[in-house]
Amino acid sequence: GSSDSGDTVKIGIFEPTSGQNGAGGKKEILGIEYANSIKPTVTINGKEYKVQLITADNASEQSKAPAAAQTLISKGVSVVIGTYGSSCAIAAGPLFRDAKIPAIGTSCTNPQVTEGNDYYFRVSYIDPFQGAVMANFANKEKGSVNCALIIESGDDYSAGFGNYFQKEMERLGGKATVLEFQKAETDFSTIMATIKSAGYDGIFAPVSIETAAMIISQARDSGVTCPIMAGDTWDDISIAQRTGDKATDIYFSAFFDAADESNTEGKAFVEGFKKWVAEDKTRIENNGGTADAISSVTPCGYDAYMAAVNAIEKAGSTEGAAIRDALAALEVKGLVTGDLKFDENGDAIKTYAVIKTIKDGDIVYSSTYNG
């Protein structure tokens, strides 16, 4: 359980602030911190407690994730929020479970995060849904029926998401052929040569932010002109900044877009968040050097925090087991990425996704998917 120092309740932030997912982790933390600025206290049995946020960097590394999780556990957190990057969530999950501390995933979309773990929940949609969304988009909107599927070897997110895309493509009568690369690869010329000679009419690349920019630039430099598609990871302004005018015909699914007029809760979030970021130099830096762009992982951080404080109040306790039970039964209306309710696996029940594209160095809204 957790011991409270004075009248505080501790919430752990389990996120990468370094490594290949550091940029994404920082944007999720901003969402969590912004939510905390709006709701800085919780009321437990009529008594007000201040929420103290404690961060541990999992460094985007599967091997370092358990130590980061252990840090939070030893500091007596009541609940954990995170992480960006499914591999780190999967690696840390058993530690949270054994310590009876519930964790709320932000944008970690691999089904394995919550599978067989009663203590892991998540607010985002998951890869089977996202894979189907993008396969339908590729097939029906872009006419891409014979895709190259670029996968990072040994990465849970990349392989899992790619597999769901491939299955749905085949169900629709199309094809997706796997082309693998090693983790630290920076030269994709062999893959591009294969794509050209095989005549693939689309690329699906569920890869990191760092790799995304290289794949886009090298594809266009080598004369590969087909649509390049991906998922939530690509919703990061740095990809647009680093690819410039090479970023043509790029599409990816995301959790949220500020331009979707049908999302009223989202509009209020966008206004408030931009103001809050603009107040502080470090916040601007962590948001990718701007107060105007909002990555769709940021509202995932916000929604996860709101779920956490709601569950603590419902539980009437700072004990992990009680908070876990409250989360399992939780229903929260009017969050930024939609109403929240968890299924028996602890996954958010979601039917909503947006598809974005890159235009004139910016990430812009393309369409909405309602399954």
Segments predicted by a language model, with ranges:
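Short, low-complexity disordered leader/linker segments with a strong preference
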Residues: 1-10, 41-45, 74, 369-371
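Extracytoplasmic "Venus flytrap"
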Residues: 12-33, 56-62, 85-87, 150-159, ...
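Periplasmic-binding protein-like
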Residues: 13-15, 72-84, 104-106, 148-151, ...
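Beta-alpha junction/loop-to-helix N-cap segments that form part of ligand/metal-binding clefts
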Residues: 23-28, 42-114, 123, 181-189, ...
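Extracellular/periplasmic bilobed ligand-binding domains
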Residues: 96-98, 162-259
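An alpha-beta-alpha
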Residues: 120-183, 201-202
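Extracellular/periplasmic periplasmic-binding protein-like sensory domains
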Residues: 221-300, 357-358, 363-370
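Segments of small-molecule ligand-sensing domains
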Residues: 281-299, 307-360, 364
